[in-house]
Amino acid sequence: MLCPSTFQPHLSPFMDFHWPVRSLWPETRPLFFQFEQEMMRHMQEMRHNMEFMERLHQRIFDEIDHVSPMTTFKPISFQLGKEGSHYALTLDTQDFSPEELAVKQVGRKLRVSGKTEKKQDDGKGSYSYRCQEFRQEFDLPEDVNPESVSCSLNNGQLQIQAPREGNTVSNERVIPITYTPAVKNPALQNSEPENQAVEAEAAEN
């Protein structure tokens, strides 16, 4: 019977020293290798995040390209009339809501403004914003008190009214005449009988 040691090569201590030695279980890795793997994982996450942000920015830019804002500045029609003894100004504001209108009185001037914004969809995935804005200024007549101006909104018509007070400034005025009754002088009253007696005596002669 052959001995198993017969088939095993004879290894000297010097030959064992040159063979690589590693542990098969449990598996161990150098610390630098783990650090490198961690860095690679972080870099990959950063790359994914950058690609996501790039796609997000591109989507935002595409949405902006689909929106084409259009702003229109134009005055609105108005009618200035006189209703009896009132100053009346009517503006066509049917395209504006009450919250989109403003009326200010500065001295003897009226400043009327409005701004509206509406979204319009063309049915093809694109839409636009239609903006309309106006600013108009009016002078109040001299016979209108600025403090008495009032405005109202009725059926899309902005109505501004104020009572007329007439011509308050005039170069002509009536000056009343004041008088007191005349008082006779007492000395003159005492000399009247003497004068009458002298006149009577002269008539007899």
From Swiss-Prot:
This is Heat shock protein beta-11. PANTHER family: HEAT SHOCK PROTEIN BETA-11-RELATED, HEAT SHOCK PROTEIN HSP-12.2-RELATED. Pfam families: HSP20. Belongs to the small heat shock protein (HSP20) family. GO terms for biological process: myosin filament organization; protein refolding; response to heat. Keywords: Stress response. SUPFAM superfamilies: HSP20-like chaperones (SSF49764). Expressed specifically in the rostral-most somites at 24 hpf. At 48 hpf, expression continues in the rostral-most somites and also in the notochord. Somite expression was restricted to the vicinity of the horizontal myoseptum. In adults, expressed in the heart. InterPro entries: A-crystallin/Hsp20_dom, Alpha-crystallin/sHSP_animal, HSP20-like_chaperone. One of its GO terms (cellular component) is nucleus. Residues 192-205 have a biased composition (Low complexity). Residues 67-180 form the sHSP domain. GO terms for molecular function: unfolded protein binding. The keyword Iron-sulfur does not apply. Residues 184-205 are annotated as: Disordered. Induction: By heat shock in the somites. It comes from Danio rerio.
